[in-house]
Structures are given as structure tokens and as C-alpha cells.
């Protein structure tokens, strides 16, 4: 009995902060999504906010942009991180540490510093990207990467990718260290090709890490906000607006808290569904 009380005593602070700062806001957000909640009114409107949301062309545009970011970033992050980790793992300790530092640097660098660097790279007049492309005769005139609706979302996605691969690479390198080397050597002695060794031995061992990386990258892509706020503010013409940015715009710029919470509920449901699908697809073969 005493041990149970002590256990609950240690858990109490964590549970308190979880209830106050996570669970309660989630419940309140869901409840207020059924209200016309702003600085001047608090009126129950039922499903009107949800009906308005699905008829809102800006919401539709933001949803499409969000889906593009998720589909474009998750597979690339997983495959690129796996490739780099597999190449890095076989290097010596010094080279491995250097590559870890290089790829993890954007992760620990503040988002403001990252956006300042990329803003200079993308600058239409003095940016290094336009300079390199023009010098290589790939383009004939400067491109406004963040100001052109045809290029802005791709430019954001590239930044998102560069800041998302650091942690997965480190995780994959660590996971590769846990692969049973005797199984790999035995398979090679039996005449297995490198692809067979990877697919039959290494890949099953890397599945738990892959599942974690896929889910975390998906959530981060759905919640992409800081880059967009600092670089494009959702423009031009909402071409880079995501659900997270549109939620912020409605809540903190237009003070339409009820409608913003409706978008938040939809976003949470989308993340839950996609994560569940990923878990079912990748998790069935995971051995813990």
C-alpha cells in the first residue's frame, strides 16, 4: 500500500501538468469548436463551424498544401536518412562523428537563424541559389523563390527536409549498431546478395526505428508553422498556407477562436488517422 502511494506521489506532478496543459486544452478546444467564440461573442452554433470549414476555399487550399508537404517530406526523409546512415555507419569513428554533427546541426539551430540563412539563399537579387543556377545557365533570369506561387511551397519543403533529416540519421545509425552481425556474416557466407541481406536481416531490425521516424516526421510536417510564418506568412495568395498556419491566422490575427478550434480538431483527427495507418502498415511486422 505504501509503495502504491509513493508511486502515485511521484506521478502526481506529471499527471497534473498533463491534465492542465494537455488534456484540458484539448477538451476545451473540442467544446469551443461548436461555438462562435471570439473577443465579442460566445454563442453555440452546433456544426456550423464544421460546415463553414468544408466550404472555405482557403481551408481547402491549406489542406492541399499540408498534404503535399506530408507526402513530399515523409518518404524522402525516411529514404534519405536510411541511405546516409547506411553510408555513414561503415566510416571510421571520426568521420562518423563529423557526419553526425553536420546533419544534426540544422536540428539544434534555432528556427529564426535557419530561416535567415535560407532567406538569403532564396533572395531573388543577391541569393546564392539564383547565382549558381544562372552561372550554370539553368535559368536565364532571377526567380523569386518565396514570392512566386509556383515555387514557394517547394522552397518551404526543401527547408523542411533539411531540418528534418538530422535526427532520423542519428537514430538509424544507432539502430544499425544493434543489428546482429553474426546473422549478416552467415547470410553472406551462404551466398546472399547485399539486397537480400538488407531486406531479410537488416530491414526487419530497422522497422521499429522506421515506424517512429515516419510517425514523428508526419506529425512535424502536419504542424509546419514557424518556417511559413517567418518566410512567407502563408503567401503569395495562400500558396504556402498550411492548416497550422491557417489555424494561427484565424485564432491570433482574426480572433475567431471557435473556428480556429474547429480547424484544430480536424488537424488532430487527420494526424491520428495517418499515424494509425502508418502503424498498421509498418507496425504489423515490427518485433519488439
Locations of regions flagged by a protein language model:
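A structural signal for multi-pass alpha-helical bundles of membrane permease subunits
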Residues: 3-288
